[in-house]
Design a protein with these regions (language model features):
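Exposed beta-strand-loop-beta-strand "reactive/processing" segments of non-cytosolic proteins
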Residues: 54-59
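Generic structural signal for isolated residues within well-ordered alpha-helices
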Residues: 14, 29-32
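Feature activates predominantly on carbohydrate-active enzymes
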Residues: 25, 29, 49-51, 63-157
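Hydrophobic beta-strand residues in large extracellular and virion-surface proteins
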Residues: 42-44, 60, 67-69
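Auxiliary, metal-adjacent structural segments of Zn-dependent hydrolase domains
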Residues: 31-53
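Bacterial Sec-dependent N-terminal signal peptides
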Residues: 1-23
Length: 157
């Protein structure tokens, strides 16, 4: 009798967990760099390009009064977020200012913006840089650096 209850319970938990919507990593990044002001205002959608997966790309449009960023990888979505913030919203994130609150009303793109790169490897720094001050960073500082790399499309740290 107990085994039936256990199996039913495990099945129910498995079903519940599989029905939860998957949150993309870029959602957490967006919350960090916008100081918690992007939720339900900037939407992300992953749609791999079927014809040519060798080029990372993102597209920025408006959907139901919200910003929609579509890309074919997590990195493309993060780069699209940075592009939107800088060129549409006028928010420049820098190494010394890696986060900023969004304005109450987000400017929407007037049309579809599409950017792509044919470069498969996008490097950042050189191999000895990591043994300078970075060796003494804590997780909070590393998270900011990883966010910075993602926002700029770096895939080869």
């Amino acid at each position: 009798m107990n085994i039936r209850i256990l199996i039913t319970l495990l099945f129910g938990v498995t079903l519940f967990c599989s029905c939860q919507p998957k949150q993309l990593p870029v959602n957490s990044l967006a919350e960090r760099v916008t100081e918690g002001t992007s939720k339900d205002r900037i939407l992300f959608r992953m749609t791999p390009e079927k014809d040519d997966v060798s080029k990372d790309y993102f597209e920025i449009t408006a959907e139901d009064g919200k910003v929609l960023i579509v890309g074919n990888s997590d990195l493309s979505l993060a780069t699209g977020l940075n592009w939107y913030l800088k060129y549409v919203a006028g928010i420049h994130l820098s190494w010394n200012n890696p986060s900023q609150k969004l304005p109450e009303v987000l400017p929407l793109p007037t049309g579809k913006i599409r950017q792509e790169t044919a470069m498969q490897n996008r490097y950042y720094l050189n191999y000895c840089t990591y043994s300078y001050s970075m060796a003494f960073w804590d997780w909070e500082r590393w998270e900011k650096e990883i966010d910075w790399m993602a926002l700029h499309g770096i895939n080869m740290p």
